[in-house]
């Protein structure tokens, strides 16, 4: 007897990341560059003091309570939306709370795509995009983030509806970011299409980018009527609050009536999927955004400075020893270039044999600079080059 649905994905699910993370934690000699979480220079998970001082004030009754609705608490929704958009979007928008950035992405996929539809995301990308696509029985098209012509060619291959995922800035795993002039070209292309276009921007790491990473949001004020922009935001990353599972989905469109309809659809899907949300986490983040922004901003700048030091050190030493990396702008990760995945697998094993724990990605090896203290990182590129 099968019992399960006929169109199930029968491939055995193995999480490539967490299995390596477990192995690293069990190895006392490990150099652990597996994590997608931010760690401090003391080797412990980085936490924002203001986040947990605020959380300590939440009562047991508040922790135990349901959120106001499947879409979340309105105060949190309003504050997180203002925080994410940063005054850049004058177009119509609506938002809802989600269980992490993954919840936002899954909600976007579940409400916009039918089985057999196509999702477009980068060739080298976060592995969970594939899991979400397979779970929904979607077709997949990929594009090269370093080649706009390849992106546009891929978009043109799609028929009646384009569902495009862009993870920028601080792309996982490459650290890639589209500059503003390329964003303008992307939006010009999407606005010119005579079909439905859903642009899903995975902005999980945006708060750790340098410069003006939200400048491209202003382009969403001049979208065509056939374009729906969805922003998937993550409190896990922004507030180093991973286990509490909180994020937001923000929808931007020219038609306010449609947005009301869309948020109703998202709320119903949420009720049928996760039912409710983390009330205490929403109360906490709302309090931080309302009453402790200055403290948060100071701690965020310290975290960004720590990441910048690590990134500059590793990239400089990789360049000096000839360890080839994909071009990186910002973020938690850098990725080594691999000729093919067979070469990648063999190299990854050599690294493991020498207690260097990293994550395999398509045609690459992801190095989580976010999780390696500067002292440990110093000289790591040379060690990895010796094993290449």
PLM region descriptions:
Residues 1-2, 82, 88-90, 341-342, ...:
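PLP-dependent enzyme catalytic core of the Aspartate aminotransferase-like
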Residues 10-100:
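N-terminal small-domain helix-loop-helix segment of the aminotransferase-like
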Residues 61-195, 206-224:
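Conserved core of the PLP fold type I
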Residues 79, 224-304:
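Conserved core segment of the aminotransferase class I/II
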């Amino acid at each position: 007897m099968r019992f399960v649905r006929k169109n199930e994905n029968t491939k055995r699910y193995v999480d490539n990341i967490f299995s390596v993370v477990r192995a690293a934690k069990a190895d006392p000699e490990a150099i652990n560059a597996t994590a997608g979480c931010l760690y401090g220079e003391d080797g412990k998970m980085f936490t924002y003091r203001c986040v947990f001082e605020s959380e300590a004030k939440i009562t047991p009754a508040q922790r135990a309570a349901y959120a106001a609705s499947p879409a979340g608490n309105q105060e949190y929704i309003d504050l997180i939306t203002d925080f994410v958009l940063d005054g850049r979007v004058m177009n119509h928008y609506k938002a809802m709370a989600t269980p992490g950035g993954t919840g936002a992405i899954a909600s976007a996929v579940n409400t916009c795509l039918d089985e057999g539809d196509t999702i477009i995301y980068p060739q080298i990308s976060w592995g969970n995009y594939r899991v979400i696509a397979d779970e929904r029985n979607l077709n997949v098209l990929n594009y090269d983030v370093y080649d706009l012509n390849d992106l546009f060619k891929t978009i043109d291959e799609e028929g009646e509806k384009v569902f495009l995922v862009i993870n920028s800035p601080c792309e996982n795993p490459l650290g890639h970011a589209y500059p503003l002039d390329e964003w303008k070209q992307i939006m010009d292309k999407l606005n010119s299409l005579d079909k439905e276009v859903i642009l899903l921007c995975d902005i999980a790491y945006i708060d750790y980018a340098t410069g003006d990473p939200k400048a491209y949001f202003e382009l969403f004020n001049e979208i065509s009527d056939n374009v729906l922009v969805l922003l998937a935001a993550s409190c896990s990353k922004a507030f180093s609050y991973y286990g509490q599972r909180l994020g937001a989905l923000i929808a931007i469109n020219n038609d306010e009536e449609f947005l009301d309809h869309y948020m109703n659809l998202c709320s119903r899907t949420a009720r049928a999927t996760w039912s409710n949300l983390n009330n205490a986490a929403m109360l906490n983040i709302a309090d931080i955004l309302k009453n402790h922004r200055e403290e948060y901003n100071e701690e965020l700048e310290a975290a960004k400075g720590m990441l910048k030091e690590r990134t500059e050190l590793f990239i400089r030493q990789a360049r000096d020893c000839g360890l080839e990396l994909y071009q990186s702008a910002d973020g938690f990760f850098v990725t080594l270039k691999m000729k093919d995945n067979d070469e990648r697998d063999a190299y990854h094993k050599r690294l493991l044999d020498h207690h260097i724990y990293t994550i395999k990605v398509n045609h690459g090896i992801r190095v989580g600079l976010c999780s390696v203290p500067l002292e440990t990182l110093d000289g790591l590129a040379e060690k990895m080059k010796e094993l290449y």
